[in-house]
From Swiss-Prot:
Keywords: ATP-binding, Cell cycle, Cell division, DNA damage, DNA recombination, DNA repair, DNA replication, Ligase, Magnesium, Metal-binding, Nucleotide-binding. Its EC number is 6.5.1.1. CDD domains: Adenylation_DNA_ligase_Arch_LigB, OBF_DNA_ligase_Arch_LigB. It comes from Archaeoglobus fulgidus (strain ATCC 49558 / DSM 4304 / JCM 9628 / NBRC 100126 / VC-16). It is an enzyme of class 6 (ligase). SUPFAM superfamilies: ATP-dependent DNA ligase DNA-binding domain, DNA ligase/mRNA capping enzyme, catalytic domain, Nucleic acid-binding proteins. This is DNA ligase. The keyword Magnesium applies.
Length: 555
């Protein structure tokens, strides 16, 4: 497929606001794609992805490299490109204008194809070490040299993972279902166990719904993790379930462990491979866990038998060098509470049976443990378990329905959580503002947004400026500086990449923001770099928490 055909289709999508029309247009486009490799790439590219989230490959191309490539191909200086970004607010549109100027004097000698873009991306992702940056710039310059102005717009946005089409996972799922006459729920399940929409589309095209139903969980391909809803209270949660399985809720990082007898891989909640950062846990898994399993659990940092704050776990996850030193400095424990695979898929079994399989697969050790669990219909026993968890330094309890299956990616009432502190929100940072006085060289406030999971759009809910130390602001400024795509006065706009956990006094209705809601007195709690943008809290959750405030007040 010519990349021009893809770009022209994206331009048409950009003008459509109706979810139903977007779904129908994408479905019709997918039906026409004959080459399976093109189909795979187009599905990912439309959703702004180059690789599935669990794939360790990444382009490693920041705005700085794009500036250099665009400067090379257009002859326009970087300072002028930055000025154009302030005018257009979108590097994709800037690239389009730059290539438009260039193409007035240059004849294209080769047409760009989707395959060529994919092959170049794969080569860029493979580059490491000395000279890799120069080679990346050369390859990017080559792509822009072949691109038409419109192709340059969407090529740039794709590299930045921000297509601006309003097409989220939900729309693409429904489009695949419509294109290849499959049940959307079957497509959803296939996606949740593979986390690869491109692969799902190819199977749907080749084998139809029957092929999708045959797709099974595979060791070393992460499964989207099941999530919990917030319970109104311990009492209401137990009442709703009648009999409940109750476990401690840990203040750590969610992990999914895959162990086939020869290799262990560990994935974070964002489905990133964090195996190399956790060599101590890997070795203990090999000693304490039977092979042929996928386990769901939480890793916590411990000191003298007490849990340490969540940030310590993240320091372990982030560490790329001197890992052995960090193992000594921040010891970890893994607490497992579920099993997804035991010599075959077992997510459709009820929790009570999965727990038995889990117990048979894990021999507890100093670092590998089973989450403590009781099954009861007594509110008093649940309260006692909750108090024990808080006394031990944990967050609260998880209350689960013993008869429930494990539904990948699902947040529902089969799992409920009760925490000691007021519920917080995990929100995407989409903008910021430079400070004043001695803080003028730091970003001092950050604009926050929740996720519309259907369209993939980020809906603003407010701005946070409190809860930061000076060290926080210095570190966050360095993190966000490369992500700035436009600036008006002191206000800047970021490529969405990071998630903040934010506390607040209450949620209010507000016409000021596209979400329709605003946070009152928001306060920064911590950076959630264990969460991807797609894992941020949704507009539905904001609405539910807004309504829950009134339920609590009535009580």
């Amino acid at each position: 497929m010519l990349f021009a055909e893809f770009a022209e289709f994206c331009e048409r999508l950009e003008k459509i606001s109706s979810t139903l029309e977007l779904t129908a247009r994408i479905a019709a486009f997918l039906q026409k794609i004959e080459d399976e490799r093109d189909l795979y790439d187009v599905v990912l590219f439309i959703t702004g992805k180059v690789y599935p989230p669990w794939d360790e490959r990444e382009l490693g191309v920041g705005i700085g490299l794009l500036y250099e490539a665009l400067e090379n191909v257009s002859g326009v200086k970087r300072s002028e490109i930055e000025s154009m970004i302030r005018e257009y607010g979108d590097l994709g549109l800037v690239a389009e204008q730059l290539i438009k100027k260039k193409k007035m004097t240059t004849l294209a000698f080769e047409e760009l194809t989707v395959r060529k873009v994919r092959e170049t991306f794969d080569e860029i992702a493979s580059l490491t070490g000395e000279g890799s940056m120069k080679r990346k710039i050369m390859l990017l310059t080559g792509l822009y040299g072949l691109a038409t102005p419109l192709e340059a717009r969407y090529l740039t946005r794709l590299i930045l993972n921000e297509m601006r089409l309003g097409v989220g996972e939900g729309i693409m799922r429904d489009a695949i279902a419509r294109a290849f006459r499959a049940d959307p729920e079957t497509v959803e399940r296939a996606y949740m166990i593979t986390n690869d929409l491109g692969r799902v589309a190819v199977v749907a095209k080749k084998e139809g719904e029957e092929g999708l139903r045959k797709m099974k969980i595979e060791i070393h391909i992460p499964v989207r993790m099941m999530l919990a809803q917030v319970a109104e209270s311990l009492e209401s949660a137990v009442r709703e379930m009648r009999t409940a399985a109750v476990e401690w809720k840990f203040d750590g990082s969610r992990v999914q462990v895959h162990w086939d007898g020869s290799r262990v891989t560990i994935y974070s909640r964002r489905l990133e491979n964090v195996t190399n950062a956790l060599p101590d846990i890997v070795e203990e898994i090999k000693k304490s866990v039977k092979p042929g399993v996928i386990l769901d659990g939480e890793v916590i940092a411990v000191k003298e038998g007490k849990p340490m704050p969540f940030q310590h776990v993240l320091r372990r996850f982030r560490r790329k060098h001197d890992v052995a030193k960090m193992v000594e400095k921040i010891p970890l424990e893994a607490h497992f509470f579920d099993i997804l695979y035991h010599d075959g898929e077992c997510i459709d079994l009820p929790l009570r049976e999965r727990r038995k399989l889990l117990e048979s697969a894990v021999n507890e050790s100093e670092k590998i443990k089973l989450a403590k669990q009781i099954v009861t219909d007594s509110v008093d026993e649940v309260r006692k378990m909750y108090d024990e968890a808080i006394s031990a330094g944990h967050e609260g309890v998880m209350i689960k329905l013993p008869s429930s299956p494990y539904i990948p990616g699902k947040r529902g009432k089969n799992w409920l959580k009760v925490k000691a502190i007021m519920e917080t929100l995990d929100l995407v940072v989409v903008g910021g503002e430079w400070g004043e006085g001695k803080r003028s060289h730091w970003l001092s406030s950050f604009e926050l947004a929740c996720l519309d999971p259907v369209t993939g759009k980020l809906l603003k809910v407010g701005r946070v400026a409190t809860g930061f130390t000076e060290e926080d602001l210095e570190e966050l400024t360095e993190m966000f500086r490369p992500l700035i795509v436009s600036q008006q006065g002191k206000k800047v706009e970021f490529i969405p990449k990071y998630v903040f956990e934010v506390a607040y006094q209450e949620i209010q209705k507000s016409p000021k923001y596209e979400s329709g809601y605003a946070l009152r007195f928001p306060r920064f709690v911590r950076l959630r770099d264990d969460k991807d943008v797609d894992e941020a809290d949704t507009i539905e959750r904001v609405e539910n928490l807004y309504k829950l405030q009134f339920e609590v007040k009535r009580q």
